[in-house]
């Protein structure tokens, strides 16, 4: 972690907006380029929060006395906080239940019950327990996370009719309209190929765009297995859902991680614990070896 990254103020992830009323092939690259500026700010903070939870917690102080004795002890309470929340609040994966015993007029109550049961069975077929745990981890640590819902291309009899994928927040985000409704207007997921180029998948209500390096549309690009990345030659597909099928979840209204507000206290605890160890070591050497 660089000195600049250490001094970042963590106040939650930025929500990305656009003033564009309708995203089309003519302006999608421009909208993506502007949104990526804010996403990169979020991405830096997300990466640092994930590393912090894993134990990458540099001490924010320089030892000026007895530099030869510099024990750095990391308590990593951030990991303990995260594990508690994952176990306490996310111990069981999400399931659908009927809100009440009231049914729409003219409907068959057994049909609604069967539909909810069927939907839960499909979720189980999609291994939702592990996917919800991954969603929970990113939500609790980073404050935001996206999931992709897509049509399963070749479902088996025991499979769900849909794919549900938890996306890494380092490589995904959602853009919202800047009006009072804050409607999601485009979902973005991207990856890097073996040549270092970034391939963006941008989903709007009516289209799916494949864009390379925020410069041009992918045109018939194929993977090493010979499969086309897109189903069309110009990098544009029709969105069969009719709406953005990348959904962004927020842990809290300020989009912060579970331990983000206590970062200063956690850093102070690491310094206190390290200085205590240094004090014991220095006192021991002074008493037993004459401070040699």
Predicted regions and their residues:
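Intrinsic disorder/low-complexity segments enriched in polar/small residues
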Residues: 4-6, 10, 31, 41, ...
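Extended, helix-rich architectural segments
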Residues: 1-170, 179
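Residue-identity detector for threonine
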Residues: 18, 24, 44, 82, ...
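Extended, charged amphipathic alpha-helical segments
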Residues: 227-292
């Amino acid at each position: 972690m660089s000195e600049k990254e250490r001094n970042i103020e963590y106040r939650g992830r930025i929500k990305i907006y656009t003033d564009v009323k309708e995203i089309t092939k003519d302006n999608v690259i421009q909208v993506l380029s502007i949104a990526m500026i804010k996403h990169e700010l979020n991405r830096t903070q997300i990466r640092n929060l994930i590393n912090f939870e894993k134990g990458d917690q540099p001490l924010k102080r320089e030892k000026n006395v007895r530099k030869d004795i510099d024990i750095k002890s990391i308590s990593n309470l951030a990991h303990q906080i995260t594990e508690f929340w994952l176990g306490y609040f996310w111990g069981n994966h999400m399931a659908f239940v009927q809100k009440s015993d009231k049914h729409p007029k003219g409907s068959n109550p057994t049909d609604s019950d069967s539909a909810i049961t069927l939907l839960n069975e499909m979720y189980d077929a999609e291994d939702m327990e592990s996917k919800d745990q991954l969603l929970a981890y990113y939500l609790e640590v980073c404050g935001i996370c996206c999931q992709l819902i897509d049509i399963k291309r070749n479902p088996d009899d025991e499979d769900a009719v849909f794919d549900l994928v938890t996306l890494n927040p380092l490589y995904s985000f959602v853009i919202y309209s800047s009006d009072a409704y804050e409607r999601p207007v485009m979902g973005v997921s991207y990856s890097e190929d073996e040549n270092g180029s970034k391939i963006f998948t941008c989903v709007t209500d009516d289209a799916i765009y494949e864009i390379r390096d925020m410069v041009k549309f992918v045109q018939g690009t194929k993977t090493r297995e010979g499969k086309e990345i897109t189903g069309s030659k110009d990098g544009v597909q029709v969105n069969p859902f009719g709406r953005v099928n990348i959904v962004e979840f927020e842990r809290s209204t300020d989009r912060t991680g579970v331990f983000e507000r206590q970062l200063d206290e956690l850093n102070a605890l690491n310094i206190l614990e390290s200085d205590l160890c240094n004090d014991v070591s220095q006192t021991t050497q002074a008493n037993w070896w004459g401070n040699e």
